[in-house]
């Protein structure tokens, strides 16, 4: 128990001789260092706030302006046009013996220079914002850049400093524009034309016209008004109504998973892998806090919004009866760990020092070696986060609002993130196709009680050292967690490394206090609620069919030879595969980002178009020449690319209609058109997984350093969820989900149709493939 006593700064006991105080120098040292570290963080935040506030200016540029003003004065040149003299006359008289005419003159010049500097910053920032409103570059053909775009790019570079911080561009990003109602309705009708017969389409046209003429103008005015004062007219409502107000389980329905590197393995030692990975994660968090991470830039010059990254760590979704809330802390010095039905609190720091990988390995090994059994009700406690939100909110209020249960729950909810240590082993074996699907299922839902689905993300560790993530969706979208994951995996492989036996480098400090077991007092009534939530979650998990596979014949290398966008190629293949699978077309959702705007998140690309359906029907007929099919395919691909660009530049369909619908609800206005649009099911929900956001290594030199992406559950009960990652020149990973309870869907069958569709389209271009 010596380590436990070190954690107490002082103790006192009352004896017949008086009060006996005992101080722990080591504990006091840690308290002191922790305080110093906290003040350092505050000072860094203040410094970054100042630097961010004056961007694209800098303290250096301020000094340059002052020196220019002072220098011109010494040369008897008044560049202020008399303003310095005016400021000098306005300064109060007799403010001390040191206020000589020279100091008054210098102070006046400093005030003038500061005013010029601030005015220049405002001008440059507004100019940069205007330049970032230009999106013509997105619609130009690859390799054919116009002179206007060249001039625009040169101006962007001139106004951007060479070393921007993570949030430097936030105030320069333009706001998401509100599209014209007529344009949105026109694009909507165009998107549903291939899905409706003539009679249904005519009825929808009438509904749309009635809405546009009678209801929409009033709703649009309120929406435009909101866009003037809000940072983003969509994002706050999207977070609240799509995510936080959802009452169904987060598991499968909302949370998504991310896979590890699957073609290489750095170590088989579970604790060692965790030591490196968690050390890398906290290094990333430190860079995030200090804003040292470079903002993601399109073309290397167009900044993407970094707002979502703020809540990556120290964030938990707190359940409520009507709506959940996101609780975000400025800092957290520990992680919560689950192993064999027990919860632990593991400190990440010793005083002000971040634990080294070998120390973290030792701490996790202590947890793995701990033989203590779970407390009553503890083993399946996390099932509360996997079940219904109302039941969890009621249980939280009834059983976790006081005493040791409150303290233990706070240790989890206030952790930097959650770590799950599994006893099973999962990995990808190319010789065993089912292995990737089993791995994905374990990440998506586990056994329904070994993940804390409310945390911003859960780091999942399998017995063989393989890892993965399960991420909550409300706080951010997949590219944000992907940015972290790329950094962590790259740091693990190329910077930290392992010994020959697979352990972390260096010797650990055995004097570290071991992780702390969280203590619970869970009554029988609460245990019954836990079991009920577990049964709900288990039924949901058992109904999910997940089929993951690596497509080996080709990747983006061959697709580029077909002179088309890789994303458009895959999306059209999905349309062909779906028609072969179901014999009909369906409303298709593809997620696109709107992060070129301030606080932008996503927009929907409706991938099922008249052009893509024409190509699919021609393929099914089998009577067209390859030249005709290629022409139809190129038209479909061009249409898809244009729709994707429109979505990225704020001219999408669904977010605008979603916000108009919410305004109608606030105003108590009934709209049959909006009600029907918002109730249409997405039977094919798709998403491309981003990669190479951080260039930590050359993929050509390390072709096996590939992650397999990740996936999510089906959006509709009778539909498919498809995510895909075009992982390299010669491979694509697919993750397909559906429900066993639907007689119309089968994930593996759909996967086979996708394979065949990709090969059939590639054959149209007669480009040799890696494998047949």
From Swiss-Prot:
Instruction: Name the Gene Ontology molecular function terms of this record.
Output: carnitine O-palmitoyltransferase activity
Specify which residues bind (R)-carnitine according to the UniProt entry for this protein: 589, 602
Mind telling me which PANTHER family this protein's record contains? CARNITINE O-ACYLTRANSFERASE (PTHR22589), CARNITINE O-PALMITOYLTRANSFERASE 1, MUSCLE ISOFORM (PTHR22589:SF69)
From which source organism is this entry?
Answer: Homo sapiens (Human)
Biological role stated in the UniProt entry: Catalyzes the transfer of the acyl group of long-chain fatty acid-CoA conjugates onto carnitine, an essential step for the mitochondrial uptake of long-chain fatty acids and their subsequent beta-oxidation in the mitochondrion.
| Membrane topology field | Multi-pass membrane protein
Q: Where in the cell is it found?
A: Mitochondrion outer membrane
Judging by the UniProt lineage, the source's domain of life is Eukaryota
An example GO BP is: carnitine shuttle
- Residues in the active site? 473
Q: Where are the transmembrane segments?
A: 48-73, 103-122
Tissue-specific expression: Strong expression in heart and skeletal muscle. No expression in liver and kidney.
Residues the record lists as binding CoA: 555-567
List the Pfam families.
Carn_acyltransf, CPT_N
- What family classification does the UniProt entry report for this protein? Belongs to the carnitine/choline acetyltransferase family.
* Keyword set includes Transport: yes
Question: Pathway, per Swiss-Prot/TrEMBL?
Answer: Lipid metabolism; fatty acid beta-oxidation
Q: What UniProt keywords are attached to this protein's entry?
A: Acyltransferase, Fatty acid metabolism, Lipid metabolism, Membrane, Mitochondrion, Mitochondrion outer membrane, Transferase, Transmembrane, Transmembrane helix, Transport
Name of this protein: Carnitine O-palmitoyltransferase 1, muscle isoform
């Amino acid at each position: 128990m010596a380590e436990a006593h070190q954690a107490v700064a002082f103790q006192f006991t009352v004896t017949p001789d008086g009060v006996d105080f005992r101080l722990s120098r080591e504990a006091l040292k840690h308290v002191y260092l922790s305080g110093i570290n906290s003040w350092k963080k505050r000072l860094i935040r203040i410094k970054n706030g100042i630097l961010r506030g004056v961007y694209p200016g800098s303290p250096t540029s301020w000094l340059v302006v002052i020196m220019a003003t002072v220098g011109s004065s010494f040369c008897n040149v008044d560049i202020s046009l008399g303003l310095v003299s005016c400021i000098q006359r306005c300064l109060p008289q007799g403010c001390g013996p040191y206020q000589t005419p020279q100091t008054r003159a210098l102070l006046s010049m400093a005030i003038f220079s500061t005013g010029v500097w601030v005015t220049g910053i405002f001008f440059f920032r507004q100019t940069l914002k205007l330049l970032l409103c230009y999106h013509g570059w997105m619609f130009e053909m690859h390799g054919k850049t116009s002179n206007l775009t060249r001039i625009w790019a040169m101006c962007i570079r001139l106004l951007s400093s060479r070393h921007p911080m993570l949030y430097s561009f936030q105030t320069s990003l333009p706001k998401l524009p509100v599209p014209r109602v007529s344009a949105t309705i026109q694009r909507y009708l165009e998107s549903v034309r291939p899905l409706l017969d003539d009679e249904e389409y005519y009825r929808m046209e009438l509904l749309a016209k009635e809405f546009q003429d009678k209801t929409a103008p009033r709703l649009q005015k309120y929406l435009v008004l909101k866009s003037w004062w809000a940072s983003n007219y969509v994002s706050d409502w999207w977070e609240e109504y799509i995510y936080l107000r959802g009452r169904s389980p987060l598991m499968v329905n909302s949370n998504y998973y991310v896979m590890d590197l699957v073609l290489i393995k750095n170590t088989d030692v579970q604790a060692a892998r965790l030591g490196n990975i968690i050390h890398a994660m906290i290094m990333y968090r430190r860079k995030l806090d200090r804003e040292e991470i470079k903002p993601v830039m399109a073309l290397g010059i167009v900044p993407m919004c970094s707002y979502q990254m703020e809540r990556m760590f120290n964030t938990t979704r707190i359940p409520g009866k009507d709506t959940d809330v996101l609780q975000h802390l400025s800092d957290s010095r520990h992680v919560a760990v689950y192993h064999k039905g027990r919860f632990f609190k593991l400190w990440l720091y010793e005083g002000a020092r971040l634990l080294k990988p070998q120390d973290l390995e030792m701490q996790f090994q202590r947890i793995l070696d701990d033989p203590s059994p779970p407390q009553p009700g503890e083993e399946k406690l996390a099932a509360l986060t996997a079940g219904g939100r109302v039941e969890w909110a009621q249980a939280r209020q009834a059983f976790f609002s006081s005493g040791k249960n409150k303290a233990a729950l706070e240790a989890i909810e206030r952790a930097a993130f959650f770590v799950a240590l599994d006893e099973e082993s999962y990995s990808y074996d190319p010789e065993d196709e089912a292995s990737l699907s089993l791995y994905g299922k374990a990440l998506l839902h586990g056994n329904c009680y070994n993940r804390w689905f409310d945390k911003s993300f859960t780091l999942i560790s399998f017995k063989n050292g393989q890892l993965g993530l399960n991420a909550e969706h409300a706080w951010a979208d997949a590219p944000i967690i992907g940015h972290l994951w790329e950094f962590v995996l790259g740091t693990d492989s190329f910077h930290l490394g392992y010994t020959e036996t697979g352990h972390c480098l260096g010797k650990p400090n055995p004097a570290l206090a071991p992780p702390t077991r969280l203590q619970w007092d869970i009554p029988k009534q609460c245990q019954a609620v836990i079991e009920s939530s577990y049964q709900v979650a288990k039924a949901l998990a058992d109904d999910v069919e997940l089929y993951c596979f690596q497509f080996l014949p080709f990747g983006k290398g061959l697709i580029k030879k077909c002179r088309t966008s890789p994303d458009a190629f895959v999306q059209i293949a999905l349309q062909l595969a779906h028609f072969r699978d179901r014999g009909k077309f369906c409303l298709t959702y593809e997620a696109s980002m709107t992060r070129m705007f301030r606080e932008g998140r996503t927009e929907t690309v409706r991938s099922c178009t008249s052009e893509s359906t024409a190509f699919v029907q021609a393929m099914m007929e089998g009577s067209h020449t390859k030249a005709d099919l290629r022409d139809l395919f190129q038209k479909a691909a061009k249409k898809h690319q244009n729709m994707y660009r429109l979505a990225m530049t704020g001219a999408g369909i669904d977010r605008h209609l979603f916000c108009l619908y919410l305004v109608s609800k606030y105003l108590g206005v009934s709209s049959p058109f909006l009600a029907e649009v918002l109730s249409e099911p997405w039977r094919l929900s798709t998403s491309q997984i981003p990669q190479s956001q951080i260039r930590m290594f050359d993929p050509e030199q390390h072709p096996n350093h590939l992650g397999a992406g990740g996936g999510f559950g089906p959006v509709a009960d009778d539909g498919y969820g498809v995510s895909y990652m075009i992982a390299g020149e010669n491979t694509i990973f697919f993750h397909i989900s559906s429900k066993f309870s639907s007689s119309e869907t089968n994930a593996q069958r759909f996967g086979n149709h996708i394979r065949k569709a990709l090969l059939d389209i590639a054959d149209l271009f007669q480009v040799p493939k890696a494998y047949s």
